[in-house]
């Protein structure tokens, strides 16, 4: 925090902007990966052919990691405040109104994704919104992708099979899609 506070910006950073940046660094950057990793495990448990394909060809992991995140969508919604009057999808929105952005819905949009409910580890392009978009794009997106690829590269290289060992227990939330408990069995 002291490094952030010591920085200067030509226009200055308001207290609200600083608090928002702190929240994004401390909390938001954690959610995608913390909830994305077990969601990716569930994707592979529910799709054994994809698991076998990734184990046979780890070079697919960069594309597969994005698909795992799109398919699971760890942060489902985010609220934004309109800064000016506008219209979205024919709906007028006044400056100051709160708008909920549904990443979960956007990541299953049939006008963007062919067969959006299908888990496809070869999906290209994959313009998912797991990390947001535009000025709110997640600063930790690259790190999260690297960590996902590293984890699954090791897990898949060290096992010959991952299978469910019980029913998962899910986090109940309108904001994040998470897993409290995920029993997994593996064969070395």
Language-model-derived ranges and their functions:
Residues 1-188:
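Cytochrome P450
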């Amino acid at each position: 925090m002291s490094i952030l506070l010591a920085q200067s910006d030509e226009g200055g950073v308001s207290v609200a902007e600083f608090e928002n940046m702190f929240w994004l660094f401390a909390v938001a950057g954690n959610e995608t990966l913390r909830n994305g990793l077990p969601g990716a495990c569930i994707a592979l448990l529910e799709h054994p052919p994809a698991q076998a394909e990734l184990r046979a060809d780890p070079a697919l992991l960069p594309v597969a990691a994005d698909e795992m995140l799109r398919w699971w969508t760890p942060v489902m919604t985010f609220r934004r405040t309109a800064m000016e009057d506008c219209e979205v999808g024919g709906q007028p929105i006044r400056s100051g109104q709160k708008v909920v952005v549904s990443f979960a819905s956007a990541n299953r949009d049939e006008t963007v994704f062919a067969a959006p409910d299908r888990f496809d580890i070869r999906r290209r392009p994959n313009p998912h919104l797991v990390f947001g978009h535009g000025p709110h794009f997640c600063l930790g997106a690259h790190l999260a992708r690297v960590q996902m690829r590293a984890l699954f590269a090791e897990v898949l290289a060290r096992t010959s099979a991952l299978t469910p060992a019980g029913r998962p227990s899910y986090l109940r939330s309108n904001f994040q899609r998470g897993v409290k408990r995920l029993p997994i069995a593996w064969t070395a």
